[in-house]
């Protein structure tokens, strides 16, 4: 049996618009990146994408992605329910902790459901170190796979000039 590759699974791509996006394949690396950006004072202009198997899916397949059942996708109500619980109770909570913003609630949320996918959107304005910024988290699961896409974007809010 060979050793697993322990290198961080991260890459950087540039979009057509010229934006730089960090792409992660691992939840821990993603969360560590957010924590480091917060500590480096670059928390208000982050654009990253995470594509991963949720921990509950890996647990059921004994940590082997090859053993994940084909029925584990957006058409499976149990998968969707567990994914939503994972997002609400773990992913968003971990983002709050990494940003050092325990008061972050993500009250502006929505759900879009189509035959091909389910998308949850979470938005919140936050203030950290006297800087306002918007946080956008989009979680998407598809009809053909247990892989989950997470887009994490923070955008600085321009300061309003005093009249």
Swiss-Prot record:
It holds the Pfam family RGI1. InterPro entries: RGI1, RGI1_sf. The keyword Cell membrane applies. One of its GO terms (biological process) is energy reserve metabolic process. One of its GO terms (cellular component) is plasma membrane. It is found in: Cell membrane. Keywords: Cell membrane, Membrane. It is a peripheral membrane protein. The keyword Cell membrane applies. Involved in the control of energetic metabolism and significantly contribute to cell fitness, especially under respiratory growth conditions. This is Respiratory growth induced protein 1. It comes from Lachancea thermotolerans (strain ATCC 56472 / CBS 6340 / NRRL Y-8284). The lineage of its organism: Eukaryota, Fungi, Dikarya, Ascomycota, Saccharomycotina.
């Amino acid at each position: 049996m060979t050793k697993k590759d322990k290198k961080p699974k991260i890459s950087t791509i540039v979009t057509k618009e010229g934006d730089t996006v960090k792409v992660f394949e691992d939840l821990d690396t993603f969360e560590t990146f957010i924590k480091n950006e917060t500590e480096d004072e670059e928390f208000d202009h982050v654009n990253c994408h995470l594509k991963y198997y949720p921990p509950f899916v890996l647990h059921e397949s004994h940590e082997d992605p090859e053993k994940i059942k084909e029925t584990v996708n957006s058409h499976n109500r149990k998968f969707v329910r567990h994914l939503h619980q994972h997002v609400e109770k773990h992913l968003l909570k971990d983002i709050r902790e990494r940003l050092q913003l325990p008061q972050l609630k993500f009250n502006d949320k929505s759900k879009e459901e189509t035959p091909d996918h389910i998308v949850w959107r979470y938005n919140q304005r936050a203030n950290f170190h006297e800087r306002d910024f918007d946080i956008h988290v989009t979680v998407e699961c598809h009809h053909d796979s247990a892989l989950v896409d997470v887009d994490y974007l923070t955008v600085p809010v321009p300061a309003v000039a005093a009249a």
